Amino acid sequence: MRADHLKFAVLVSANAEWKALKPSFPEARIEDSPYGQFFFERVDEQTVLFCHGGWGKVAAAASTQYVIDRFNPERLINIGTCGGIEGRIRRFDVVVPDRVVIYDIHEAMGDDPREGVAYY
């Protein structure tokens, strides 16, 4: 499935988040990109690109730019949360931040957010 005019691209960073998302679309044809996996799916009569780009600011920036350059979506939606807010956000909460804190993440960190928090 390809989109002549792609309205939405959904970006997913963490492996655990990508693993949780894929079963929602069991018929999806998973493809590989230089940054991770992606697939197209129809959602409410719209073709939507779902892309796993990896975590960390470099991987996120690179995979986001790849999606923009290759697919030219009108809107980018980034799903997931950072591990530093554990216990403050519940499942299905929608978070609209009023500020962002950027810090370097420890590259050996896995998907368990406690590993990164313990490192710092």
Model-derived regions, located:
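N-terminal short beta-loop-beta anion/metal-coordinating cradle
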Residues: 2-71
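Short, active-site-adjacent cap segments at secondary-structure transitions
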Residues: 17-19, 83-86
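Structural motif
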Residues: 75-77
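Short, electropositive, low-hydrophobicity segments enriched in small/polar residues
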Residues: 57-58, 84-88
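Mid-sequence, gly/pro-rich, charge-dense loop/helix-turn segments that line enzyme active sites
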Residues: 86-120
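Short, low-complexity, polar/charged sequence segments that are solvent-exposed and flexible
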Residues: 28-32, 68-72, 95-98, 113-117
